[in-house]
């Protein structure tokens, strides 16, 4: 994958527009989870160190296009950036006709989704973005799967279009995990439905040695293998699909599970062998025997890709399976990559972030890359690099 990289460019005195993913949760006008902002800081700092006049843009939420809405304003993000960078980061609302930014200064543009034509990737808007800068830097992996004005269109028209350090690191880590993975490779794919992760399961079944499934997905595979799953969430119409995937790759199934009579934080948890699951049981986690077996598989892997917790870890009594696997991934010598919102929450809960080789910031983009789909914002950077 050949793209121009911001790190290789001379930015002294250049106007640089950086597209970051600053779509963070805001509560009462204050940023409530700052992971994405923290991830963007090294790129912004590097551009400033290189002597650029820096303009940062992002979307936040899903406002009605073309209309300002206070709840989707990036003002809280501008306030956060000012503190984090130790300098004033003004929020600029009217920027499409040009902005006065001096070398060594940084401004944040108001939500790009307030601009008509952003979602539709309108050429006219993209050309306005491009006219603002000498160099466009795409650094938002989390929105790279969307062809929008500020992620794709601007890269077509900017004088120079490059990948930022965060985007470049994501592509390198995913390329390493999927392109030429160290063997053996184990993937964990968990979630409520096979149908939503079908392309991921199919794609990984072609490159993995072991495909560990969890959550409702595991229940569908268990039912497909003839096991009773009680009143657990599963997809009866996808049993043949599960069997077809299991015929292509080793899918180790749970031998014991943690069940409850109801889905609730107060529900009593009972460990049962899979053969003993009753008609009124709900499977909400893998059992200790299964967790220990899966942990051994992970510890002997060369590459691990983790997408999704294997149980309802939000409730502690159904979190031991995910905790055991998280600790095993942390202790493994494998190159490990993790992605997806629930996965990141589990990593935080069990304190293993430092021991995972790479944590992807992109949810949908992460999955689409794993599925083997082309990410439009990356494709346009490749095309520009060839030209």
From Swiss-Prot:
Primary residence: cytoplasm
Catalytic activity: (2R)-3-phosphoglycerate + ATP = (2R)-3-phospho-glyceroyl phosphate + ADP
One BP term from GO: gluconeogenesis
GO molecular function: ADP binding; ATP binding; phosphoglycerate kinase activity
Keywords assigned by UniProt, alphabetized: ATP-binding, Cytoplasm, Glycolysis, Kinase, Nucleotide-binding, Transferase
Signal peptide start-end: none
Pfam families: PGK
Pathway as given in its UniProt record: Carbohydrate degradation; glycolysis; pyruvate from D-glyceraldehyde 3-phosphate: step 2/5
Top EC group: transferase
Residues engaged in binding substrate: 21-23, 36, 59-62, 113, 146
Enzyme Commission number(s) of this protein: 2.7.2.3
Top-level division of the source organism's lineage: Bacteria
Positions bound to ATP: 197, 314, 340-343
Cellular compartment(s): Cytoplasm
PROSITE patterns membership: PGLYCERATE_KINASE
One Gene Ontology CC term in the entry: cytosol
Family the UniProt entry places it in: Belongs to the phosphoglycerate kinase family.
Assembly and binders: Monomer.
Name this protein carries in UniProt: Phosphoglycerate kinase
